[in-house]
Amino acid sequence: MAIKKYKPTTNGCRNMSVSAFSEITTQTPEKRLLVSHKDQAGRNNQGKITVRHRGGGVKRKYRLIDFKRNKDNIVGKVATIEYDPNRSANIALIHYLDGEKRYILAPKGLTVGMQIVSGKEADIKVANCLSLMNIPVGTTVHNIELKPGKGGQIARSAGSFCQIISREDKYVLLRLQSGEVPKVLGTCRATIGEIGNESYKLINYGKAGKKRFLGIRPTVRGSAMNPNDHPHGGGEGRAPIGRKSPMTPWGKKARGVKTRDRKKASNALIIRRRTK
């Protein structure tokens, strides 16, 4: 994906960059694969904030993505590469021979007119989907299942991928970009290749207003709050924290404390923890 940079003609344009959308082939999505989606603004079903700094932004229609890739042995043809406002990756519209249309995550190198297929007989080719046990060691994959039939959960954002490094009995070992090495059942599915739009992380929004369009609200420092809002708040002028260590907004130590549950069931399937 190419990045378009702006000249500093205004303060908002200084250092600003956007995607050139050179891979996008249409601006009209498939209407039958759109559903209404109400923004929850970071609230759960009780109305409590569970994710801070969310709210507002432009309205979006949700695109129904095929994460399961369970349409076996039916060839599909790539009709379009489209922008998806709900994720960092682009999506591809697939026309199958039986007449059905589905969206999939667009991997790097996928172009209009290419043919893809799912199933154990599929070739090791970009955008084809197979069980992990049928994919050679060393292959890069994305959209990886953690439970057979549940749909892909790992490596779904722009530029992400995993590499198959070995097999152990009924398990396959993957190397994530973080350096973590988990064991995944060999019957779980994965898609060949890495997600496209890899330059997404280089985008500079330039001004706060563009972040607000995306539904991202300001992040306020704890030291700028009142003491009833944050443990760092209060004091006269620029006061120090006043505690032995930095705290989260909920009063827990913020640095140097491991946050993963020691009794989590998936701990037994992680061979090496992440390194970054």
From Swiss-Prot:
**UniProt feature, compositional bias: Basic residues:** 252-276
Query: What keywords does the record list, in alphabetical order?
Result: Ribonucleoprotein, Ribosomal protein, RNA-binding, rRNA-binding
* Gene3D superfamilies named in the record: 2.30.30.30, Nucleic acid-binding proteins, Ribosomal protein L2, domain 3
Please verify whether the record's keywords include Ribonucleoprotein.
Answer: yes
Example of a GO MF term: structural constituent of ribosome
Residue ranges of the region described as Disordered = 221-276
| Family matches, as PROSITE patterns | RIBOSOMAL_L2
Task: Decide whether keyword rRNA processing is in the record.
Answer: no
Pfam families membership: Ribosomal_L2, Ribosomal_L2_C
Listed under GO biological process in this entry are: cytoplasmic translation
Q: Name one GO cellular component term.
A: large ribosomal subunit
**Record text on subunit structure and interactions:** Part of the 50S ribosomal subunit. Forms a bridge to the 30S subunit in the 70S ribosome.
- Xref: PANTHER family: LARGE RIBOSOMAL SUBUNIT PROTEIN UL2M, RIBOSOMAL PROTEIN L2
Q: Which family does it belong to?
A: Belongs to the universal ribosomal protein uL2 family.
Q: What's this chain's function?
A: One of the primary rRNA binding proteins. Required for association of the 30S and 50S subunits to form the 70S ribosome, for tRNA binding and peptide bond formation. It has been suggested to have peptidyltransferase activity; this is somewhat controversial. Makes several contacts with the 16S rRNA in the 70S ribosome.
- What is the protein name stated in its UniProt record? Large ribosomal subunit protein uL2
In its UniProt entry, the species of origin is given as Aster yellows phytoplasma
Name of the coding gene: rplB
